[in-house]
Amino acid sequence: MKKDIHPKYVEITATCSCGNVIKTRSTVGHDLNLDVCGNCHPFFTGKQRVVDTGGRVERFNKRFSIPGSK
C-alpha cells in the first residue's frame, strides 16, 4: 500500500444559516457554511407546502391544444 496518498481526514464544523452547529469529519479541510440542515429544512420540520400546478397545466393544454381535437 502506498503511503501519504490519501487526503487528511480532519474534524470540521458545519454551521447552518439557522445557527445549528454540526461537528463532523471530512477531507475538505476547512469549516463549512450550510444553507439548510435537518433542523430547518421544510421536509424535516413538517412545514412543507404543496405547490399547485393545476392552473399551469390547464394553461399549457389550452395554449397548445389542437383545435377540433376534442
UniProtKB/Swiss-Prot annotation:
BP term (GO), one: translation
What's the record's note on cofactor binding? Binds 1 zinc ion per subunit.
Quick one: which residues bind Zn(2+)?
C16, C18, C37, C40
State a single Gene Ontology molecular function: rRNA binding
Q: Name one Pfam family in it.
A: Ribosomal_L31
Q: Which GO terms describe its cellular component?
A: ribonucleoprotein complex; ribosome
InterPro entries xrefs: Ribosomal_bL28/bL31-like_sf, Ribosomal_bL31, Ribosomal_bL31_A, Ribosomal_bL31_sf
- Which keywords appear in this protein's UniProt record, sorted alphabetically? Metal-binding, Ribonucleoprotein, Ribosomal protein, RNA-binding, rRNA-binding, Zinc
- Per its Swiss-Prot or TrEMBL entry, what cofactor is needed? Zn(2+)
According to the lineage, what is the superkingdom? Bacteria
Q: Does the keyword Lipid metabolism apply?
A: no
Assigned protein family: Belongs to the bacterial ribosomal protein bL31 family. Type A subfamily.
> Subunit composition?
Part of the 50S ribosomal subunit.
Q: Which HAMAP family match?
A: Ribosomal_bL31_1
Function statement:
Binds the 23S rRNA.
Name the record gives this protein: Large ribosomal subunit protein bL31
What's the source species for this entry? Answer: Cronobacter sakazakii (strain ATCC BAA-894) (Enterobacter sakazakii)
Q: List the top taxonomic levels of the source.
A: Bacteria, Pseudomonadati, Pseudomonadota, Gammaproteobacteria, Enterobacterales
Name the gene. Answer: rpmE
